[in-house]
Amino acid sequence: MSKAPPEPFAVHLPSGDRLLLRAFGDEFASRLETVDGYAAIYDDASKSYVYATLEDGAYVSTGVSVAAPAPEGLAKHLREAPLIRQHRFTSRYGELRPAETDGLETFGHNAGLLTGRQRSHGAVRGLTILVEFDDVRAGMSTDDLEPLMNADDYRRHGNFGSVRNYFQVMSAGKLDYTNSVVGPVRLSRDKAYYDQHLLVEEAIQCAIDEFNLDLEDFATQLPGEPRKIVDAINILYAGESWYTRTGNGNLWPHNHRFVKRFGDVETGLYMLTGAGNSAAGLRIGTICHENGHLLCRFPDIYDYGNRDQDDRESEGIGYYCLMGAGNHLGYRAVPAPICAYLRRLAGWTTDVVLEPGQSYQLRHGDYGIAYLHATDRPSEYFLVENRSAVGFDRYLPDHGLAVLHCDTLGSNEWQDGTQWRHYQCALLQADGKKELEGNLNRGAAGDLYRDRTGVFLSGDTTPNSRAWNGSRSGLILRDCSTPGETMTVAVGPETAPQPEYQEAYPFEPIPDDAEQGLEVTMEFPAGTSAQRIQVWVEIVHTWREDLQLHLRAPNGSSVVLRRRHGGSGDDIRETYDSEDHATLGKLTADDGGGTWTLWVRDLAARDVGQLEAWAMQLG
């Protein structure tokens, strides 16, 4: 699956005009707009692109070419009704993802990954076929394509490495993915024909016939499987990728399963994308994205907009991962790294558990390490990584420390951020704006953390580090450095927790000469430290030596704060502190959460009074 590119693409009209359009969506459901925002569709009758309007919630042709001015009164940014979009998505998804094959979805049913066999470790050999059409010739040769797929230190045409190099770096050397490149093979029809008819079978057969291929060279027999299956087939066709038809174009970059037996070998997963008009147009981004599905069984971590009982669009992780929209960065020549969440699921990382009170130096590009904070749920955790403007991160929309909130049971359709509906991998956007969830952009300045002093992420900040069920995960980050090759961050609170203070004004009379006395209470939240206890009491009374004060803790333990001393005097205005009141010190505890009770007794007759106020501070 491949999300639409951010930049406009060119289409050629029957008149000979060349026009720019924008695409939104992916190969399952997409829509087109002119660069000034009018909805456009391909009109089969005129074999051209026309302005679209809505009829019963669906796009219909206005009959006016997009090369002409827009019809008067036509609104911009028209969208089909949700039910229409859902129907288009379901129909196309059924074509590309038949039920009897392994899922290729945003839901990672296999502990976060897609079902089906993984080829994410060791040496893997793929087959790459360069394809041209009867009317469109390839603008490059296999001599141009082979280094794009396999070379060390590949830097041609703005690319920051080859496909092989990309996966070597991301896997910390655990995956060595090479490709045999053949072609070009010329197909029998014009390019437009294959937008409606899948070219895969013809391309594979042509490659076998013309280059005497033995598919067994690219196949693996895994334990428990009776047959050999080709690991990966990459088909790159002549010209730019076509993002043309609304939801039904077979030339939209995609991956799928094509199953056919060739002798003792069976084909399996393939990917398909445009190669560009010349060697200068060769880019690794989309090839790496689709091979993330083929080899590693990575799900897309962007929002299809039409899955899992959700028809609202969002951006998921945006540009911050190859499997979001990150394959488009650097004009698809410098794709974003695979995020720590997916690298960890692939088995490419070793966990470094973030310990409170420790400081960490996070080196950029140390892709074999995952800095982890676990929660009480095994499927849910936080990951922290250095995403400074270095290497494959150079074109990110922001740079700094990224914090990912991960749950293998989430869905990348669910932008709600609630206990039951949340992303599989959510970027905690440092500015708290949640623009990715709001479908406002694919990433922007302010998304990542940098140059922070003191606590910048906890259960009480915005954004916060609470688990999806609202409980505190315990993750506290502070003192984040400037972005660079190495970033430092400390874990745990900067100082001891702030004391919890409460006060009350009962103005309650104290029963005279009565054993039961007066009881008043205060409630402190669970987890409140009671290493130090301070109590303030104010009582108006005509003979204070009649009074005795007790304090009872939530666990039932009780101490006497003030005994009857004899003598005379009015009123009590006193402070009791566990640091210099040995008896009160017996109630100190790590957790003082619960109900505290002040018990006031007047143990002699005649003189009376009342409890005006009292206060407690726990810390």
Q: Could you describe each region identified by the protein language model?
A:
Residues 107-173, 530, 544:
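Boundary/activation segment at the start of structured domains
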Residues 1-115:
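N-terminal prosegments of processed precursors
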Residues 166, 170, 227, 231-396, ...:
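Extracellular hydrolytic enzyme modules, especially secreted metalloproteases
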Residues 6-8, 18, 48, 125, ...:
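Exposed beta-strand and adjacent loop surfaces of beta-rich binding modules
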Residues 363-496, 591-609:
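Extracellular low-complexity, Gly/Ser/Thr-rich intrinsically disordered linkers
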Residues 128, 235, 296, 323, ...:
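Residue-level detector of buried hydrophobic side-chain packing
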Residues 495-619:
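Loop and turn regions of beta-sandwich accessory domains that flank beta-strands and are enriched
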Residues 99-102, 107-120, 158-265:
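Active-site-proximal segments of metallohydrolase catalytic domains
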